[in-house]
């Protein structure tokens, strides 16, 4: 796949390369352990090596690439310990935010949740796990933002990458799609009817779906 990225602004080129490579890694088009090179990427997208090198550096900071001077660059393997740490953090924070949402949640945010749940149903019917993955993330982000905790959500993203990679892999394997949708629908209803205990329970169960089995 060749995509030209001719932009006057080098930062824009770097950002585009970064976003494309991140999506390819997160969605396993570039698989863990796969070798990639600055030369290959710069030729594929017809850009100089400088923005590619900068994109590689950013991806390595996020734990998605491992860069070895004089040896090359590869897509990082998934560290299951980091996955479990991220899941643990999200479980604790999402339970707290679910309770907050039951106290006060804007109507506009509630509408977004309801529409999101409907779109998840459509994604499942179409067997579109990439869309379901994106809707899942957007669903949780909407709850945080609706509670005035957008900065907390942004902070979570710093540890969230290994967790997201496992979640995407499991969705691709047709892992509990309907259960995920049902839990989102139930959590939306619990928030709408201000059932704190129920919302907290569902949030915990939802994150328990991705407890890492290190024998898998």
Annotate each PLM feature.
Residues 15, 81-84, 130, 150, ...:
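Residues in well-ordered alpha-helical elements
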Residues 25, 101, 124-125, 147, ...:
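Hydrophobic residues in alpha-helical segments
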Residues 89-105, 137-174:
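Hydrophobic, amphipathic alpha-helical faces that serve as interaction scaffolds
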Residues 8-10, 95, 114-121, 126, ...:
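C-terminal all-alpha effector/ligand-binding and dimerization domain
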């Amino acid at each position: 796949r060749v995509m030209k990225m001719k932009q006057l602004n080098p930062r824009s080129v770097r950002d585009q390369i970064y976003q494309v490579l991140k999506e390819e890694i997160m969605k396993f088009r570039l698989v863990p352990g796969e070798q990639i090179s600055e030369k290959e990427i710069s030729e594929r997208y017809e850009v100089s090596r400088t923005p590619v090198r900068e994109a590689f550096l950013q991806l390595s900071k996020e734990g998605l690439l491992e860069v070895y001077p004089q040896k090359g660059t590869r897509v990082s393997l998934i560290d299951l310990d980091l996955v479990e740490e991220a899941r643990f953090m999200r479980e604790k924070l999402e339970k707290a935010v679910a309770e907050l949402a039951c106290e006060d949640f804007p109507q506009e945010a509630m509408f977004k949740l309801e529409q999101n749940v409907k779109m998840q149903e459509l994604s499942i019917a179409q067997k579109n796990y990439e869309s379901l993955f994106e809707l899942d993330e957007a669903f949780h982000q909407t709850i945080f933002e609706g509670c005035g905790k957008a900065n907390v959500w942004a902070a979570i993203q710093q540890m969230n990458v290994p967790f997201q990679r496992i979640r995407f892999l499991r969705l691709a394997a047709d892992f509990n799609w309907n259960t995920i949708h049902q839990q989102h629908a139930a959590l939306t209803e619990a928030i709408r009817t201000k059932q704190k205990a129920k919302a907290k329970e569902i949030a915990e169960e939802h994150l328990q779906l991705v407890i890492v089995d290190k024998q898998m």
